[in-house]
C-alpha cells in the first residue's frame, strides 16, 4: 500500500464509536418496539416544546448571515484558485439532487393535507383560510430560509477546504480558529465529530424510512406484490447496490449522471402534473400562496403557540428546522466539494435561487394536485391513511392523474433514482469524514462508502419496523439537538478565521 493510500485509510476514533453507538441504539430499539415508541414520544414532546424557540432563532440569524455574505466584503472572494469543476446547470442539478430525495415527493404530496386539516393560528380545519395558508407554509418550510443556511455553511467549508487548504473534512477540523488546535485534536474534537456522524446516520435512515414505502407501494400498484417489510429490505438493498455502481465511476461520472437524469425526469413529471392537473388553478394557487407567505412570514418565523398550544409549530416548523439542521453539515461538505472555483456570491445566490425554485415547483404542483383531489371529493385522504397508511394515500394522489399506469411508472422511477442520489451524497460525505485525511481532489475509499450505505439501510429498516411518522420525526429532532451547537461553532470559526486570512 502506498503512503498516500495508507494516509487515506479510516480514522478509528471517528469510525468505530458511531458504529458502536448506532449498533446499541438499533439493538435497544428492536429489543422492545413498544417501549421504544414510548421513549420516542417523550423525547419528541420535550425537545419541541422546551427548545423549539432555539431552532427558530437559529434559522432567522443564519438567514441574516446569508445577506451578509451576498452583499458584504467577502461576496467576490473566490473559493479556490481553479475554474469551476462543473457547468452551472449541472452544478445546480447536483445540488438539488443531493439535497433532496424521495422524501421530497413524500412531503410534497401529503404535507398540504396535514396543514389544511389541522391548520395553524387557530384556523378551522378545511376552511378557506386553512387552504390558503396550506401551500404558503410549505413554501416557507422549503424556501429561501433553509437554503440560505445551507449556503452559509457551504461557504464556510469551501473556505476551509479550498482557501485554507485543509485536508481533513470533518466539523472539528474547522474549529481550530475558535477553540485551538489542542482541543480540536483532543477529546473535544472527537466528541464533536462523533455527534455529527451519529446524527447523520440517523438522518439518512429517516430519509430511507420515508422513501422506501413509496417505492414498495408503487410496486404493489404496478405489479400487485404485497407491501411487506421484506420487500422494503429488498428495495433498500437495491439502492445500496446501485450506490456502489455509481461511486465506482467516481464523483464526476456517477453522481453527475444520476443527478442529471433525476432532475430531467423531475421536470417531466412536474410538467405532466401541470398539464393534466389544472394549470390555471396551480398557477393561481401558487401566486396567492406567495402573497400569503409574505403576509404571514413574520408570524411564521417566530410562531411557538405558547398560549393556544395547538402543537402546529412543534409538529412541523421545529421538526423541519431540525431536519435542515441535522443535514446541514453533511450537505454543506458535499456542496462545498462541488462548488470549487465559484465566488461566495455565486454560491449563495445560485444555491438559494436554484434550489428554492426546485422545491417550490414540487410543492406547488404536487400539493396543488392533492388539494384539488380533496376539494373535488375524488379522494378521501383521512380514510386512506387510516386503512392503508400515508404512503398509500400519496400513491393514490398520483394514480388519480390521467394515464395512471404511465404516471405511476414515472413516479416509481423518480422515487428510486432520487434516493440513489441522496445515498450517493451521504455515503460520500460519511466516508470522507471518517478518513484520516483527504487531499484536495481525492476520493474516499469505495468499500468505506458502501459500508456506510449498508449501515444506513439497516437504520431505515428499523424505523420502518417501528411504523408511523413519529419515530422518523423524533430521530430527526434528537439528532438535530447536538448538531445545532456544532453548526453554530463552525459558523463562528469561519467568521473569525476569514477576518484574518480573507482581508480586503
From Swiss-Prot:
Physiological role: Catalyzes the exchange of L-carnitine for gamma-butyrobetaine.
InterPro entries, per the entry: BCCT_CS (IPR018093), BCCT_transptr (IPR000060), BCCT_transptr_CaiT (IPR023449)
Keywords from the named record: Antiport, Cell inner membrane, Cell membrane, Membrane, Transmembrane, Transmembrane helix, Transport
Catalytic reaction list: 4-(trimethylamino)butanoate(in) + (R)-carnitine(out) = 4-(trimethylamino)butanoate(out) + (R)-carnitine(in)
PANTHER family documented for this protein: HIGH-AFFINITY CHOLINE TRANSPORT PROTEIN-RELATED, L-CARNITINE_GAMMA-BUTYROBETAINE ANTIPORTER
GO terms (BP aspect): 4-(trimethylammonio)butanoate transport; carnitine metabolic process
Subunit structure: Homotrimer.
GO cellular component terms attached to this protein's record: plasma membrane
Family: Belongs to the BCCT transporter (TC 2.A.15) family. CaiT subfamily.
Subcellular location, principal: membrane
Record's protein name: L-carnitine/gamma-butyrobetaine antiporter
Record membrane topology: Multi-pass membrane protein
Disulfide pairings: none
Pfam families reported in the protein's UniProt record: BCCT (PF02028)
Species this protein is from: Proteus sp. (strain LE138)
Subcellular localization(s) per the UniProt record: Cell inner membrane
Pathway: Amine and polyamine metabolism; carnitine metabolism
Amino acid at each position: 500500500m502506498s503512503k498516500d493510500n495508507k494516509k487515506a485509510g479510516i480514522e478509528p476514533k471517528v469510525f468505530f464509536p458511531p458504529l458502536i453507538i448506532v449498533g446499541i441504539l438499533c439493538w435497544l430499539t428492536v429489543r422492545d418496539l413498544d417501549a421504544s415508541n414510548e421513549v420516542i414520544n417523550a423525547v419528541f414532546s420535550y425537545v419541541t416544546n422546551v427548545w423549539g424557540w432555539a431552532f427558530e432563532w437559529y434559522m432567522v440569524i443564519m438567514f441574516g448571515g446569508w445577506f451578509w455574505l451576498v452583499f458584504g466584503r467577502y461576496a467576490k472572494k473566490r473559493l479556490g484558485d481553479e475554474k469551476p469543476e462543473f457547468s452551472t446547470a449541472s452544478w445546480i442539478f447536483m445540488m438539488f439532487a443531493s439535497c433532496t430525495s424521495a422524501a421530497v415527493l413524500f412531503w410534497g404530496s401529503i404535507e398540504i393535507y396535514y396543514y389544511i386539516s389541522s391548520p395553524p393560528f387557530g384556523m378551522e380545519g378545511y376552511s378557506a383560510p386553512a387552504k390558503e395558508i396550506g401551500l404558503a407554509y410549505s413554501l416557507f418550510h422549503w424556501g429561501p430560509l433553509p437554503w440560505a443556511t445551507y449556503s452559509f455553511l457551504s461557504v464556510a467549508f469551501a473556505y476551509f477546504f479550498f482557501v485554507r487548504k485543509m485536508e481533513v473534512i470533518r466539523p472539528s477540523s474547522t474549529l481550530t480558529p475558535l477553540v485551538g488546535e489542542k482541543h480540536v485534536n483532543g477529546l473535544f474534537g472527537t466528541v464533536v465529530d462523533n455527534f455529527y456522524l451519529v446524527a447523520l446516520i440517523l438522518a439518512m435512515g429517516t430519509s430511507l424510512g420515508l422513501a422506501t414505502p413509496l417505492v414498495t407501494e408503487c410496486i404493489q400498484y404496478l405489479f400487485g406484490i404485497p407491501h411487506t417489510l421484506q420487500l422494503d429490505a429488498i428495495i433498500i438493498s437495491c439502492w445500496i447496490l446501485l450506490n456502489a455502481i455509481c461511486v465506482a465511476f467516481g464523483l464526476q461520472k456517477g453522481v453527475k449522471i444520476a443527478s442529471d437524469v433525476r432532475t430531467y425526469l423531475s421536470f417531466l413529471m412536474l410538467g405532466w402534473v401541470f398539464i393534466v392537473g389544472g394549470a390555471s388553478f396551480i398557477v393561481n394557487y401558487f401566486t396567492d400562496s406567495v402573497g400569503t407567505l409574505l403576509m404571514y412570514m413574520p408570524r411564521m418565523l417566530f410562531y411557538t403557540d405558547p398560549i393556544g398550544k395547538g402543537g402546529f409549530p412543534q409538529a412541523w416548523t421545529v421538526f423541519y428546522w431540525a431536519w435542515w439542521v441535522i443535514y446541514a453539515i453533511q450537505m454543506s461538505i458535499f456542496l462545498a466539494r462541488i462548488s470549487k472555483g465559484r465566488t461566495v456570491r455565486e454560491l449563495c445566490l445560485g444555491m438559494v435561487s436554484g434550489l428554492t425554485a426546485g422545491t417550490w415547483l414540487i410543492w406547488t404542483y404536487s400539493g396543488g394536485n392533492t388539494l384539488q383531489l380533496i376539494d373535488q371529493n375524488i379522494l378521501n385522504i383521512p380514510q386512506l391513511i387510516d386503512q392503508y397508511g400515508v404512503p398509500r394515500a400519496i400513491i393514490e394522489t398520483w394514480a388519480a392523474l390521467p394515464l395512471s399506469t404511465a404516471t405511476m411508472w414515472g413516479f416509481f422511477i423518480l422515487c428510486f433514482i432520487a434516493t440513489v442520489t441522496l445515498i450517493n451524497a451521504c455515503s460520500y460525505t460519511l466516508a470522507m469524514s471518517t478518513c484520516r485525511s483527504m487531499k484536495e481532489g481525492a476520493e474516499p475509499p469505495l468499500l468505506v462508502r458502501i459500508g456506510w450505505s449498508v449501515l444506513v439501510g439497516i437504520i431505515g429498516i428499523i424505523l420502518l419496523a417501528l411504523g408511523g411518522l413519529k419515530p422518523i420525526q423524533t430521530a430527526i429532532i434528537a439528532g438535530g439537538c447536538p448538531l445545532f451547537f456544532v453548526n453554530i461553532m463552525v459558523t463562528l470559526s469561519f467568521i473569525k478565521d476569514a477576518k484574518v486570512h480573507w482581508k480586503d
